[in-house]
Amino acid sequence: MSYSFAEKKRIRKSFAKRASILPFPFLLATQIQSYTDFLQAEIAPGKRKNQGLQAAFNSVFPIESHSNNARLDFISYMLGSPVFDVKECQQRGLTYAAPLRARVRLTILDKEASKPTVKEVKEQEVYMGEIPLMTDTGSFVVNGTERVIVSQLHRSPGVFFEHDRGKTHSSGKLLFSARIIPYRGSWLDFEFDPKDYVYFRIDRRRKMPVTTLLKAMGYSPAQILADFFEFDHFILVDNKIFFNLIPERLRGELAGFDIVSEDGKVFVQKDKRITAKHVRDLQQANLTKIPVPEEFLLGKILAADLVDKETGEIIALANSEISETLLGRIRQTQSSEISTLFVNDLNYGPYISQTLRIDETTDQMSAQVAIYRMMRPGEPPTEEAVLALFNGLFYSPERYDLSVVGRMKFNRRVGREELTGSTTLSNDDIIDVIKILVELRNGRGEIDDIDHLGNRRVRSVGELAENQFRAGLARVEKAVKERLSQAESENLMPHDFINAKPVSSAIREFFGSSQLSQFMDQTNPLSEVTHKRRISALGPGGLTRERAGFEVRDVHPTHYGRVCPIETPEGPNIGLINSLALYARTNEYGFIETPYRMVRNGRVTEEVVYLSAIEESQYVIAQANANFDQNGVFTDEVVSCRHKNEFTLASRDQIEYVDIAPAQIVSVAASLIPFLEHDDANRALMGSNMQRQAVPCLRAEKPLVGTGIERVVAVHSGTAVRTIRGGVVDYVDASRIVIRVHDAEARAGEVGVDIYNLTKYTRSNQNTNINQRPIVRMGDVLSRDDVIADGASTDLGELALGQNMLIAFMPWNGLNFEDSILISERVVSDDRFTSIHIEELAAVSRDTKLGTEEITADIPNLSERQRARLDESGIVYIGAEVEAGDVLVGKVTPKSETQLTPEEKLLRAIFGEKASDVKDTSLHVPAGISGTVIDVQIFTREGVDRDKRSKQIIADELGRFKKDLADQMRIVEADAFQRAERLLTGKVAAGGPKKLAKNSTITRDYLENVEKHHWFDIRLVDENTSLQLEQIKDSLVQKRKLFDLAFEEKHRKLSQGDELPPGVQKMVKVYIAVKRRLQSGDKMAGRHGNKGVISKIVPIEDMPYMADGTPVDVVLNPLGVPSRMNIGQVLEVHLGWAAKELGKRVNEMLASQRNVSDIRDFLNKIYNNSGKQEDLTSLEDDEVLALARNLSSGVPFATPVFDGAHESEIKQMLKLAGLPESGQTTLYDGRTGEAFDRPVTVGYMHVLKLHHLVDDKMHARSTGPYSLVTQQPLGGKAQFGGQRFGEMEVWALEAYGASYTLQEMLTVKSDDVNGRTKVYESIVKGDHKIDAGMPESFNVLVKEIRSLGLDIDLEEH
């Protein structure tokens, strides 16, 4: 077993019983793959698939003019390179995007020739706007901020059958309906009403009889009846009527006459119910014709028009009911045969026949006109318009698109073998749907479950972007069509037709303000990954949270292995926003698939098959915890499994698939909760949601008890830095790592050096700190994909969201009542939960009417203390400690001293004189913020002079870039000279520097005495070697040129003006790092949904302590466990204690300098006792010592979800650590030194500090802004508002009879404007008198009443 660089340093002991045969898939694959397929940027134009941008262009082009004499064809598209990289876009507030250019061809046809010939062809590349590019981590940078496009779960196109569950009609009768949903186009609904008529609706408009639609499609009534009914045939011979008998059709009917054979045998007597036995008897007798009385025909419905053969006269139309009168006419015409519809009340209803009767249309045209009137009320129906509308509804590819998915789902549902076909509807499609609907009403078939994941599909970012791009192109198409008619006369080129604005605005709107384009949750690496794996049922074309019912939100059996049943928000969005399960992926149709191991001949193989929800239901699938031996043969006779979405038991030879892993059913966040199987689902939901809110601590600490997936999340999120190629660490400092790449991995022509610039103290979207730290040293040998630097919340390449705290479960003086948390002062003093938050503040210098605002240090009335922090440009220096109210950027705005006369205004305008008086509009530190200035960025518009500070920032940036280039050049040169030395040593020279003799052999000593760049002047006898030397020299010269060009490009980028909003001359951004220590009121939580607020920070000496004198860090209330049913936290605490103590044992061995073999033996006892076996023999002695040093703070354990440590294994570890197997110990009161009455559960728990910090919530105001109308103080911290004294608070004061306090609250402390001023004056004078007047809101009320026409006057008393 091979370990990666970081894994070797600290191996996590896993209790997993079953090794997963499938590695964890790349967690961001859904996003990245979807957008790659959309762009197809790396694929040659000729080989691109018809998807994404290619499909959007193909769907709109070619565009033809109205007269068909000019055509615009699309050939291919090309994506350019982005101007700025991701980091530069974030700093400058730009969108990380690439220019899109489409090559189009304009063809002008000569219509006047006998046959259309090509007159002129013009080809050109046309700019189509900018397309945002995805970053390596699956996000987008839009206007400088990172955003995520959330995938949408919507109802798949296709046909769906359902009923109203008896809710529509008071009788509870089930009303069936069918709906054909296209990807794009009109919805078509079919439905039954309570009277059993069948109606259709288009786009949920007024309903019409379904036969109207059938007639509009060209079907006659007789054809409609023939399609939907089976017929009964009657033969009329010599005034006798014979019935062609099909015995099966008579079952359940009441015999109206004796059923007799020709020889007189009575099979069924009159008025008897025909049973299955009667039917069998009739079939055995092979009776095909029976005589029936005339009355039997009464009430039957004619299947076809009844025509008098002699005269050709139509006696009765198809669908007419046979009455006595009609029967008489039939006798007279001497018809030999009559066909009627076979209907009954039980399972062959006359629904279409009834509907045909209420249909008022007579022929195809009248039916189409009726549909036109329903769709376009008020418009006159001309024949052309009627036909155009009807054909455009479902038959036109431009207007209607069922999509490949829709066609597949449609064909599968109506029972066709072929799963592909036209993406528009055909007449057969509509007929088939109505047939199935009628069959459902007749009691045959099943309705669809719309919450089944086989009926819901995922639209990922690529598909969503494609739809927006297509919508933009469709707008372009209209404009192009108009202009194409002028193509020939005005000699226009292709770029004259295409205006890219509609396309770029559609894309910009989608990425900037769509409901599915969300501001990325960047609190910690897990929240990033989870956000990108989120699946939302909301958004355009989806559900709304008001209309979504319980069923849509509920967990469905098909969610198994596809969508996490645990992770979803609490509140109004519950169940509508879900998370993709750990191993799930989407297939080509957008349906979620999950992997299974195939079972062949009763043996579990290692072959992995992905199944969608539709495919899965037909198989018998065992769970991952099924027991099987080494050969894959099940050991149990009966195995728990799933079949047809039900949990059941099956014999082992019936099993067809097995789950891939126990963690398959949950999402990333839920799979990070150890002992998840022991937690109640509600608490697990809170636990997975709260992990996303954990603030990165100053020093990340790996969880002692994890699940083994921590490394995957840290690496896949992009937070931890991985090597692109293997190599040796050449240089490392806090901000950069230089790696000399292995020769085997460096491709020809590539630079054999990789430089990783680390992110230092950068602000995330949530103001948390992103900081990367190297974990390698110079000389370390690395492989590809090794972790070389930790990011926020990662420790040695593992996710570390919180800190391991020593926990005691016990009450303590009521301070941990109701989930409150008691914390030791040591936790604060050791900076265990201290976090850094970075605030971004911006000052903007604008052009005003009176002149330009100036950023300067020369500010009126500024104290020396404040001015000392500013440099000569008026900008705060980096490293300054600032507090609320301090000046960060000095800025003055010109102000008009007096109101100018028009003449003065004119003179000012002519002579360009600026205002002489200025006011201070400097950027101050807002209330509640104090910290250290860590960075300043200055952006200047093109043409505006840069100040000294701005020039210095550019010089520093160029210096850093130059250092990178110098390192690259140093390694490239060293590599080149090394190759040259190997090439030259021992070769015969033809001459060279330092008087190298002809035909002498070149030695290493000679080369050392010659300057290296003169080696290339050596002339060699062997031409081949000379050529190789020349190639090395050329390659070196080429690299130098490339580096010079790169430096020039960087210099050009930094020196050019910045894009700023209109009217802005200069913008200064100041970044302040705020250190937040733990304090009372901060919210903390474990990973099991056990959350609480810190009630008190207790001195270390007062905390309960153990027998060895170790005080506990945190005291939790034991009553928080039983009612919440999250026992996982107790097991975590036990195992955490064992982990810590084992670490101490390892540390003691290191301290006493024990032999490496002893340490190996002890580590073997830990790692290879139970669970997953670790190969410690593959480690060298120094690697074992490095591992032991890293384990001294605690041996990390992994207890995978649903496959974790058992109670016996926890006890075993406690025993190995020399701890009581109960996990409890006697604690002593820190204040009295007395032992507590009974042993207390003590151990280590991974505790998180959540992003609900009391500093962000606490807020105080004395005076501040007031509302304009009511003159009452504003509300909320952001507005620096006051606390609302509401109705109930008024009642409280009234109840106490505190009339003066109440008057003060409602007047001078609120909206009595004059009273406020007077109170201020009286306080200044030292006289605390209150003179309450009229509240402003009362005046507002008076005005309101006056507006209603009631005059109110106030009288003075």
UniProtKB/Swiss-Prot annotation:
What are the record's GO terms for cellular component? Answer: DNA-directed RNA polymerase complex
Q: What is this protein called?
A: DNA-directed RNA polymerase subunit beta
> Which keywords are on file for this protein?
DNA-directed RNA polymerase, Nucleotidyltransferase, Transcription, Transferase
The EC number(s) this enzyme carries: 2.7.7.6
**Subunit-level organization:** The RNAP catalytic core consists of 2 alpha, 1 beta, 1 beta' and 1 omega subunit. When a sigma factor is associated with the core the holoenzyme is formed, which can initiate transcription.
Quote the gene name from the UniProt entry: rpoB
Look at the named UniProt entry and state the broad enzyme category this protein falls under.
transferase
Task: Supply the Pfam families for this chain.
Answer: RNA_pol_Rpb2_1, RNA_pol_Rpb2_2, RNA_pol_Rpb2_3, RNA_pol_Rpb2_45, RNA_pol_Rpb2_6, RNA_pol_Rpb2_7
